[in-house]
């Protein structure tokens, strides 16, 4: 009898213990479910913020219109169903959640709405913060935690992402502008009433040896543009050393997103040993120090001039660029008056990528108008006769025409890798190996042929806005 009562008491105690344990187990299960909901929502919000920030950053080009477009792209990205509510619906981003600044680590007070940015030219970074959004995107209604406390009936979570551009597609080689004027007429009575355009002294359609120019003296002036240090300060010598500069010559980039009106650190001279790095663009990687992944060849590696049967000039140029001579050290194509015409081969190849342009005091909306090949005798007087284009000169420049192209073998090419974006400096510069220089503008030059020691031949194709050279948008935080 006593044993029976003792067994009943034990079963009762076990039932009580089981009930208590069951409550705890259910509590932990509820906690896991509710916390899992919060973690899942936070993951969705982070994906949403990352995507929206990247979409917005791609529109930031230093203009008010770019800021407006960035807001639109961020909202459009969030509205997509790819990252929100188990891919069942999009989210609505409010303006309060989208902010812009001039640096990814800017203090809270330096992040502004699109319409309140002090200087759109510097606003190259965007932050998407879902916790600032209206309505709230991170509020999660709990299923079990509310039973423990009314304060736990809803939980809030959020995510933040910062994206922007950290580079410029700018070659770390700088040269002197040949004049101080961004656009000026070239004196040539034979062309009247038409007038040829000069841009900082350079002529479109003419190839220059970029390592043999100096508008202020007989000795060549060329510089390393510091690819690592921010504009406005002279960086340490390691930043302009050959080993530091080499990968940026290969890629044609620098690691800052903007120059603006700031001065840049330049080092003279540009190292003579770095010329092979330019030739990766022609699929010549051996000995260049460049890798085929970060420095692929161009889709067209044919050098100009060449011996192909469809060569478009009636003469064979002496070199892949116009010859440089004199004091100041200029190409034979540069003197405007009272100059003895050069030999016909001295002009180098003409119009391989760009055509000479007609000057206009106001730049036409569609760009400057080109001259015709029939104008070559007036544009390029020479001895014994001016260079001439064959009747088969293509409607589009030879580089862009299939019959004048050679594709690389073994490596995948990237179009227009032969384009070099070169800072044009306000010269003369102060004496010394490391100085600060003002950038007048950025010239676009097309490599006509592989470089060699002391020779970097590139045809001028006009000026390019800095905002058009910003690197790819990157997720930074």
Regions found by a protein language model. Give the residues of each.
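Generic detector of ordered, mature protein regions
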Residues: 27-29, 44-52, 58, 67-69, ...
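N-linked glycosylation sequons
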Residues: 109-122, 127, 137-477
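Short amphipathic secondary-structure patches
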Residues: 2, 39, 43, 55-140, ...
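Alpha-helical assembly-interface signal, strongest on the long, hydrophobic N-terminal helix that forms
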Residues: 1-80, 422
């Amino acid at each position: 009898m006593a044993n029976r009562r003792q067994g009943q008491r034990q079963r009762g105690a076990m039932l009580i213990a089981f009930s208590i344990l069951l409550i705890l187990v259910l509590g932990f299960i509820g906690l896991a479910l509710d916390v899992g909901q919060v973690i899942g929502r936070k993951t969705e919000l982070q994906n949403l913020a990352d995507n929206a920030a990247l979409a917005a950053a791609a529109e930031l080009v230093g203009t008010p219109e770019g800021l407006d477009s960035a807001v639109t792209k961020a909202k459009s990205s969030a509205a997509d169903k790819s990252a929100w509510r188990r891919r069942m619906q999009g989210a609505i981003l409010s303006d309060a959640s989208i902010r812009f600044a001039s640096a990814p680590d800017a203090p809270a007070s330096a992040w502004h709405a699109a319409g309140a940015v002090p200087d759109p030219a510097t606003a190259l970074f965007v932050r998407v913060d879902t916790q600032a959004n209206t309505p709230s995107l991170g509020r999660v209604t709990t299923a079990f935690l509310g039973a423990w406390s009314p304060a736990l009936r809803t939980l809030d979570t959020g995510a933040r992402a910062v994206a922007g551009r950290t580079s410029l597609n700018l070659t770390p080689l700088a040269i002197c502008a040949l004049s101080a004027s961004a656009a000026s007429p070239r004196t040539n009575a034979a062309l009247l009433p038409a007038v040829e355009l000069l841009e900082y002294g350079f002529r479109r359609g003419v190839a220059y040896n970029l390592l043999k120019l100096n508008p202020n003296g007989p000795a060549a002036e060329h510089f390393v543009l510091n690819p690592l240090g921010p504009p406005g300060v002279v960086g340490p010598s390691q930043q302009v050393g050959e080993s530091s500069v080499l990968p940026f010559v290969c890629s044609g980039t620098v690691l800052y997103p903007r120059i603006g009106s700031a001065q840049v650190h330049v080092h003279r001279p540009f190292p003579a040993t770095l010329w092979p790095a330019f030739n990766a663009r022609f699929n010549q990687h051996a000995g260049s120090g460049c890798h085929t992944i970060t420095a692929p060849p161009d889709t067209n590696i044919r050098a100009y001039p060449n011996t192909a049967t469809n060569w478009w000039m009636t003469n064979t140029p002496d070199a892949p660029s116009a010859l440089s001579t004199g004091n100041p050290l200029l190409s034979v194509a540069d003197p405007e008056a009272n100059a003895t015409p050069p030999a016909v081969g001295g002009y180098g190849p003409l119009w391989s990528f760009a055509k000479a342009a007609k000057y206009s005091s106001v730049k036409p909306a569609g760009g400057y108008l080109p001259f015709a090949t029939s104008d070559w005798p007036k544009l390029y007087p020479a001895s014994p006769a001016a260079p001439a284009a064959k009747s088969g000169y293509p409607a589009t420049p030879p580089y862009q025409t299939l019959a004048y192209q050679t594709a690389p073998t073994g490596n995948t090419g990237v179009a227009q890798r032969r384009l070099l974006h070169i800072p044009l400096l306000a010269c003369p510069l102060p004496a010394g190996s490391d100085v600060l220089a003002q950038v007048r503008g950025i010239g676009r030059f097309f490599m006509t042929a592989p470089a060699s020691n002391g020779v970097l031949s590139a045809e001028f194709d006009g000026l390019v806005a800095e905002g058009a050279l910003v690197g790819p948008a990157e997720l930074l935080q």
